[in-house]
Amino acid sequence: MEWGPGSDWSRGEAAGVDRGKAGLGLGGRPPPQPPREERAQQLLDAVEQRQRQLLDTIAACEEMLRQLGRRRPEPAGGGNVSAKPGAPPQPAVSARGGFPKDAGDGAAEP
């Protein structure tokens, strides 16, 4: 006996099920479903509701980004806080306590 899509097994005949009732409810009728137009409208309403939720989420994200943009971020280099405006920038001090070496001078670290 074959086991493919057209076999007796896939049609339910091997289990003793009448071909006319295979895959149907107890009474041999399919479960009641709303008409296609009603189901289509339900799906459309669900899609529109989800779209509104996503648009609300996007608007909230844009508002947060606007609020964050109003704040002035600190300088990326972590500049000297005590420096006065217009003063020359102070060199950064490395974690080892010394000034950073020029990467191109070839000098070895101590």
Swiss-Prot record:
Q: What is this protein called?
A: Uncharacterized protein C1orf122
The leader peptide range reads none
Q: According to its UniProt record, what is one Pfam family this protein matches?
A: DUF4726
Region Disordered: start and end of each range?
Answer: 1-42, 66-110
Q: Does the keyword Lipid metabolism apply?
A: no
Q: Superkingdom of this entry's organism?
A: Eukaryota
Residues folding into a coiled coil are 36-68
Keyword set, alphabetical order: Coiled coil
